Structures are given as structure tokens and as C-alpha cells.
Amino acid sequence: MTPTHMNITLAFTISLLGMLIYRSHLMASLLCLEGMMMSLFIMTAVMASNAHSPLINIMPIIMLVFAACEAAVGLALLVSISNTYGLDHINNLSLLQC
């Protein structure tokens, strides 16, 4: 395993660990989730550049689009919860059920 792959894997693992530790606050969870997506994006971009195939080069861009959509939905939910309840605790999500 090259040092680049090891660093990217370590970044993903640290983000996953942060997600498990700070799971009670939505903002911290969103930041950790974004760190996981960025490390996956970099890993996919490195793998695509090593593959030398033009069909694989579109995969990191697609992953980046999904990460942006996920961040937008998460931030919209965060704003909605913080405006309604004044807190960003994840246990407030159960109060949003219809």
C-alpha cells in the first residue's frame, strides 16, 4: 500500500470515527460525512488516473455531484431544525415525523 492510499484510508477512518463519536449533533455528523465523501472522491480520482481508461474518469465527477447534493439536503435539514427547535441535536429528527 502506497503512502497516498494509506493517508486517504486514514482520512476516511478518522472521519468515520468522528461520525461515531459526534453522532448526537447534526452539524458535526454532516462535517464527518463530508470528510468521508471527500476521501472517497480523492481515492476514486487516484484510481481513475491509474486506470488510464476514459470511461472511468467520469466516476469521480459523479461522486462529487452526489456529495454536493447530500450536503445541500443536509444543510437544508440543519437550517430547518435549528430554526424550529433552536438546537441541532439528531434526536430532534424523531419529532419531524408526520
UniProtKB/Swiss-Prot annotation:
Its EC number is 7.1.1.2. Its main location: mitochondrion. Keywords: Electron transport, Membrane, Mitochondrion, Mitochondrion inner membrane, NAD, Respiratory chain, Translocase, Transmembrane, Transmembrane helix, Transport, Ubiquinone. It is a multi-pass membrane protein. Disulfide bonds: none annotated. The chain crosses the membrane at residues 1-21, 26-46, 61-81. GO terms for biological process: ATP synthesis coupled electron transport. GO terms for cellular component: mitochondrial inner membrane; respiratory chain complex I. GO terms for molecular function: NADH dehydrogenase (ubiquinone) activity. It is found in: Mitochondrion inner membrane. It is an enzyme of class 7 (translocase). It catalyses: a ubiquinone + NADH + 5 H(+)(in) = a ubiquinol + NAD(+) + 4 H(+)(out). Pfam families: Oxidored_q2. PANTHER family: NADH-UBIQUINONE OXIDOREDUCTASE CHAIN 4L (PTHR11434:SF0), NADH-UBIQUINONE OXIDOREDUCTASE SUBUNIT ND4L (PTHR11434). Belongs to the complex I subunit 4L family. Core subunit of the mitochondrial membrane respiratory chain NADH dehydrogenase (Complex I) which catalyzes electron transfer from NADH through the respiratory chain, using ubiquinone as an electron acceptor. Part of the enzyme membrane arm which is embedded in the lipid bilayer and involved in proton translocation. Core subunit of respiratory chain NADH dehydrogenase (Complex I) which is composed of 45 different subunits. This is NADH-ubiquinone oxidoreductase chain 4L. The gene is MT-ND4L.
